[in-house]
Amino acid sequence: MARDKVRYVGEAIAAVAAESALIAKRALSAIKVEYQPLPAVFDPDEATRPGAPVLHDYAPDNLTKHIPIRVGDVEKGFAESDLLVEETYTTQPIEHAYLEPEAGLAYVDHDGVVTIVSPDQNITHHRHMLARILAKPISKVRLVMSPVGGGFGGKEDMIYQGMLALLAMKTHRPVRLVFTREESIISTAKRHPSRTVLRMGLMRDGRICALEMKVICDGGAYGLSTEGVMRKAAILAAGPYAIPNVKVDTYGIYTNNTPSGAFRSFGALQTAFAMESHLDICAERLGLDPFEIRRINAMRDGAVTHTKARLTSVSLTRALNALEKASGWEAGPPNSRGDTREDLGRDDVRPPCALGARFKAAEEQEAAE
């Protein structure tokens, strides 16, 4: 819950335990809160400007994480290119919209062990966090993971478990909490909104000479998974393509928006959307087929990524060939053929972009594997 300062609309400031939901609602309505307006910032670009309100007293600015990656000489690659294409791509915050809202049960047994039963996607980390919050040894905190009624990464962050545990300790009774859909939407983390500026240099035959990408993600008020998202975005920025010169910068920024957290494709979606969209634009300007420009630049077996990881097996070209055949692409894109989704019996096909990734020790390069 907020302490001294509320940083986003939807942040909890008080919790009430009652015999019924109706009584709890009446008790909540009786609480009167006086707010003192404070300067706020809702745009990541504005949050990085001199004089912008700093959200957290312990931090010198609103930057949560910056991940730089450098390979080769980007400016030289641009100078040698026949075509330079620069575009900006944005993605929005997205609600997880799982069927089951946040819910949990907490109780304290005769040995003083606090038990929380909840659909939790990050149970080990949350156990350690709760031990700190409750000022208890880890042996006195027990988490039980109930079946998860949909998560998609949205239940990796600890939003309500601390309140549950504290209420159980204060009341000495079991406490159950179930968010309404409105409470779930307003208070829980969303996918990181992003703005990506992508500049690419290519030869006339479609070979990519250089890539420069700057990704700014809105971490919201607390940036719950922002550091991990920024690392993954940087590692996967160039996609499964062999590019000799790469410059990538990913930035996570605090704002007074709803916190951003984990969502499926953890950090990969933002950069993949920009990269794949950009390749389509470049293919059109060069008069190349979208599948062909990807085949030209696709990594092969034994390729080394821009984070120095060697890939022993790369199936991209095989996947592209299979997708091209399955989509009937040789007859032209579906929209140019006048086909509808019902005619095709499937969605339009997009070439995939995916690599696994792990983070190595500080003295080693970030590596995708």
Show where each model-derived region lies.
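Structural alpha/beta core scaffold segments of enzyme domains
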Residues: 1-369
